[in-house]
From Swiss-Prot:
Taxonomic source organism: Candida albicans (strain WO-1)
Record's keyword terms, sorted: Membrane, Mitochondrion, Transit peptide, Transmembrane, Transmembrane helix
Protein name as annotated: Altered inheritance of mitochondria protein 36, mitochondrial
GO cellular component, one term: mitochondrial membrane
Gene3D superfamilies linked: P-loop containing nucleotide triphosphate hydrolases (3.40.50.300)
Transmembrane segments: 56-75
InterPro entries: P-loop_NTPase
Places the protein is found: Mitochondrion membrane
Gene name of the encoded protein: AIM36
Length: 292
């Protein structure tokens, strides 16, 4: 019987020997036959347990919703605490013009029309009698042209009173909010008035325009020459600038108006009229000779 079992057990015994020879770790060695390193390896085997997979997508979704809610409430609080805007930038004014169809196009009066329409600006004038005297002297020196005085302050008031005017609602909003007029707004109102004049019978004549109390910033001066026409002369009334300007304007406004004089003086377009010491009539004689 034992002889019969030997052939059957021989392959199993042989395979066991081969495995033992190839992989000695598979055999069980008594502890008293093991080396210290084998004992340490046996006691410090790391067993990797399967971790439960957390719902990552659901977690991220909740975090995203929570962040949106937090941003919403923070933004609302910031808007409520944000102080009212105290200025109206040129970019905001341009956006307003684009939205309302009032965007500026090319220069209103081309260079070929400069001999027909001339513009004289007075950055600051306090005495209306002096303004009339300037207009009369200009009319006397250039009898072939009419003289038209433009008062930007009066044009602004007309815009406020008439709801049909282009800038009525903008001016109304700015006044209600106590915000200053944006750079370019006064120039835009003046441009509208000049455009209206040019499209009437009055616009068919050669005209010398006098714009009072304008420009009072170099920004407005540049915009006028970019959007409307070249400025012939900037007339500085010496007495009003010296005596009346400090009484009626803040230091910042005075500085801005004086900068206008400096700007036109740098390009040779500024003329100071000193009536008491140098007759104004003589000054206009020089202006007319320069224009010819």
């Amino acid at each position: 019987m034992f002889a019969r079992l030997v052939p059957r057990l021989q392959p199993q015994l042989l395979s066991k020997r081969v495995l033992t020879a190839r992989y000695p770790m598979l055999t069980t060695t008594p502890i008293y036959h093991q080396t210290p390193m084998q004992i340490i390896k046996r006691n410090y085997v790391i067993v990797h347990r399967e971790r439960k997979k957390e719902p990552v997508i659901r977690y991220l979704f909740y975090m995203l919703v929570a962040s949106w809610v937090a941003i919403y409430f923070v933004a609302n609080r910031v808007d409520k605490k944000k102080p009212p805007q105290q200025s109206f930038t040129e970019r905001e004014f341009q956006s307003y013009e684009e939205e309302t169809g009032l965007k500026r196009r090319n220069k209103l009066i081309s260079h070929t029309m400069n001999s027909k329409y001339k513009f004289y600006v007075i950055p600051y004038v306090h005495d209306e009698e002096e303004l009339k005297k300037v207009a009369n002297l200009l009319q006397h020196k250039d009898e072939n042209a009419t003289v038209k005085i433009i008062d930007p302050a009066q044009l602004i008031e007309e815009q406020k009173k008439d709801e049909g005017m282009k800038y009525h609602y903008l001016l109304e909003d700015l006044d209600e909010q106590g915000r200053p007029y944006p750079p370019g707004l006064i120039t835009a109102v003046i441009k509208q008035e000049i455009y209206k004049i040019l499209n009437t019978r009055e616009g068919t004549f050669d005209t010398n325009f006098i714009i009072k109390n304008y420009p009072q910033t170099t920004n407005e001066a540049i915009k006028f020459e970019n959007d409307i026409s070249d400025i012939q002369k900037c007339l500085i009334l010496h007495y009003d600038m010296l005596n009346e300007l400090p009484k009626n304007k803040t230091n910042e406004e005075q500085r801005a108006i004086k900068n206008v004089d400096g700007y036109f003086n740098s390009v040779g377009k500024s003329k100071t009229l000193v009536e008491k010491f140098d007759p104004m009539d003589k000054e206009f004689e020089e202006i007319m000779l320069e224009d010819i």
